[in-house]
Every structure is written in structure tokens, then in C-alpha cells.
Amino acid sequence: MPMKIENGPFWKRVRENLDNDFMRGAVAGMQDRGYVRRLGVIEELGHWEEWRSLAEQIRKHTLENLDFYLMQLSENVAKRGGHVFFAQTAEEANEYIRRVALEKQAKKIVKSKSMVTEEINLNPVLEAIGCQVVETDLGEYILQIDDHDPPSHIVGPALHKNKEQIRDVFQRKLGYTKSSDPVELARHAREMLRRDYLTADIGITGCNFAIAESGSITLVTNEGNADLVTALPKTQITVMGMERIVPTFEEMEVLVSMLTRSAVGQKLTSYITVLTGPRDEGDVDGPEEFHLVIVDNGRSSILGTEFQPVLQCIRCAACVNVCPVYRHIGGHSYGSIYSGPIGAVLSPLLGGYDDYKELPYASSLCAACTEACPVKIPLHELLIKHRQIIVEREGKAPVAEKLAMKAFRLGTASPSLYRFGTKLAPSAFAPFAEDGRITKGPGPLKAWTESREFPAPSKERFRDWFQTRQKGGNPS
């Protein structure tokens, strides 16, 4: 499935990003500032754990009755004059949207931020038929004009770029001549994008939450770009993962409140856009034609399994914003559009273990992600389940790990081998030990001892010590 954003071995990507001092500083700053803002709005709301439990109940109930609510949504969209397409795969979703673009003879398409269109790799499909696709979220716009640089964060896709880098991109691609002042950069982008809104044939959006009872879709933004993407083009296409649905507006209000506080530390974002089908007669704006593409792309295979809780995700990135591993390696190290703890759980499920078998190990299992999640996804537990599957079912554990575990099993199962090993260990590790500590370990211990020390094996075994004590001796 077309989710990969980076090629090359996982550890090579990690090493490269560990050497990126700006990226690491930007991520650390984002996490620290976000923590303070989030804590403030959570305390102001009050009863946060009760809110989390309510949000969890809403998501669980919806997933347990997903077929009913998807059918209700589909019927209500159709009643409003919209078209609904259920896409089992990324290819089916892309082909449907491609056909709509060809039918409308579209030359220009404007898009608001959408993770699922990144997931299915939609843009190249439309560009291949001659459409100019313009991302209108400022972060996504910056990445697009910078030769399609992939996003590194679910909410802040251009987090890995500083203002000087963005200025250079604007100078190179847009003829920008002013300073690196963020206000000037944003003003220039706004002027460029305004022309695209007015001349676009099709608008494409993602979906934060679809409302089953009304056939509406909601979009949560701080830039207002979704308003223009849905209001100006004659044809509107919304692409949503099949799990991004709630029964009524009441549930949507709860989840939006949790989303905005968890994602950006705000009570509400600047804009919440609600779109319900094509424009009615007499309306002055809105699309003449509306299409809703509901994407499966592996999600149905997660339903009913031990990993079903991951589909509760509302894409707030709260788990990413507290993750100590993400803090050091950034988003591109994950090799998937979904980074951080949620990406480490979701990417192997949607993209397979062959490409993402390392991600469940990119975690300290500190459970900060689970505590931060506003819908109570047990992320650290799901990471452990992935590790178990990788070893037991998939057989994809590293060769060194397999050999080490086999040797450990044989040694602990045989008393004679165990005694021999405990006698040999002090001599074997002596060249690497100093004052009873191993500071530069061999083999698998090398990476471990780069950031911590390892206790050297004792010269006197516990069994020998105990026997001496039993005989009334003076154990050392």
C-alpha cells in the first residue's frame, strides 16, 4: 500500500535524523510548548479523565456499529444529492477520483489537509492526467513546492523546516524577494493561493468527522482554507477513512473539543467547517456536485481484532507530542506518513510488517502516549502485541536476537551449560570492563553502552558465594 515516504534501512534513517540538530531542536520545542498549552486548556476544562472516558465510549460504540452508521451516512448523503463511493483499496479510491476529474475536464484542483489522501498517494494519480494539484494548508503547501518533501508530523507537516529554509524555497519556486519573517512568508503564500481558489475546477478535502444522522462532513482548521476549498470550486470531493464517523452532532462536539485541546492546546480552532451535500437552489456558494469517497484500505481487517482500538484515533497527534523517541528521531525516520506511536501501531497494520517491522521497537514503552491519548487507545500495549506477532507469527525478529534467545534458552535449560557460562562470562567481558562497569560493550551491547553503562559479570558467582556462607566462611 502506498504509504511509504522514505526508502532505505530504518536505522540509516534514524542515524541521519539524529544528526539533524535543527529538527531535533524544533521537535523538542514543539513538544515542550505544546505540553504547557495542552495542560492549561485541560485544567480549564476540568474532569479530563471523565471527558476521555466519554470520548472513548463514543469511538468504541461507533466502531462496534460501524456498518450501521456508514449505511446511515451513505443514505443521508444521497438524500442531499451527493454521490457516495466505497473504496476497498487505495487503487479503487484513486481510480474513482481520477474518473471524476476526467469527466469534469479538470485542470486545477485545490486540496485542504488530508492524511488519507497522503495515505493513498492521490496527488501523483491526478498529476498523471494533467491536473495541477495545489495543497492549500500552509505546511503542506510548503512541502509540495519543495519538490514534494514528505510530512514529518500529523498536525504540523513542515515541522522539520525553519523559516530560512522556507524563505529559500519561496525564493526558488515562487519568486519571493522579501525576508524570512513568518508574517511576510504567510502573506505571500496567501496571495499565491487566492488565485488558485478562484480558478480551481475541483476541491478535495479530508474529513475530521462525518455525521451519520445528517450526511454532513466536518473539517477542523486554523487557516480557513477548507472553507474556500469547499465553497468555490463547482465540484467537491471528500475522502475519508471509513472509521472517521460519529452518530450525531452531539458526539462530534465532544470529539472536536478533545481534538483541539489535544492537538494544538486550544479550546477550539479558528474554523470548523460543516458541509452537507451540494448547494441547494438559492445558495450563493458551495459545490454544485458533491462526492464522498469512503476508504477501507485495510481498516476492515483491523475490525474485530486485538488492534481495533487503534481505529478510535482522531488524528490529534497527542501521542506524537509526548513521545521521547519521536523527540529524538523526528517523523521521517518512521518511513510512513503516520509517525510517532500511532504510526508505529498503524503503519504495520495498513502497510505490512515487511516495510514497518522496526516501528514497534521504536518505543521505550513508557506509556506516555497512552496517558496522553484523548480516546484512551492503549498504544504501548498494542506495540507489545506487534512485537509478539513479529517474533512468533511473522518470524521477522533480527538474526542476532534469534541467536541470542536460542543461546539463552539452551543455557538456562542445561545446568552444566549455565554453570560453564557463568564461569566464562567474567573473563569474556574483562577487556570491556572498568571498575565493575562495561562502558564500551561488544556486539549488541555497543549501542546500549553508547548512552548508558552495563554492569560487568561478577567474578564470584552467587552459588559459590552462598556455599561459602553456608560453610561459615567469610564471603567477599
Swiss-Prot record:
Gene3D superfamilies: Alpha-helical ferredoxin, NagB/RpiA/CoA transferase-like. SUPFAM superfamilies: alpha-helical ferredoxin (SSF46548), NagB/RpiA/CoA transferase-like (SSF100950). GO terms for molecular function: 4 iron, 4 sulfur cluster binding; metal ion binding. [4Fe-4S] cluster 1 binds at residues 313, 316, 319, 373. PROSITE patterns: 4FE4S_FER_1, 4FE4S_FER_2. [4Fe-4S] cluster 2 binds at residues 323, 366, 369. InterPro entries: 4Fe4S_Fe-S-bd, 4Fe4S_Fe_S_CS, FTHF_cligase-like_sf, Helical_ferredxn, LUD_dom, LutB, LutB/LldF, LutB_C. Residues 304-334, 353-382 form the 4Fe-4S ferredoxin-type domain. Residues 467-476 have a biased composition (Polar residues). Keywords: 4Fe-4S, Electron transport, Iron, Iron-sulfur, Metal-binding, Repeat, Transport. Residues 440-476 are annotated as: Disordered. GO terms for biological process: lactate metabolic process. Residues 449-466 have a biased composition (Basic and acidic residues). Is involved in L-lactate degradation and allows cells to grow with lactate as the sole carbon source. Has probably a role as an electron transporter during oxidation of L-lactate. PANTHER family: LACTATE UTILIZATION PROTEIN B. Belongs to the LutB/YkgF family. HAMAP family: LutB. This is Lactate utilization protein B. It comes from Geobacillus kaustophilus (strain HTA426).
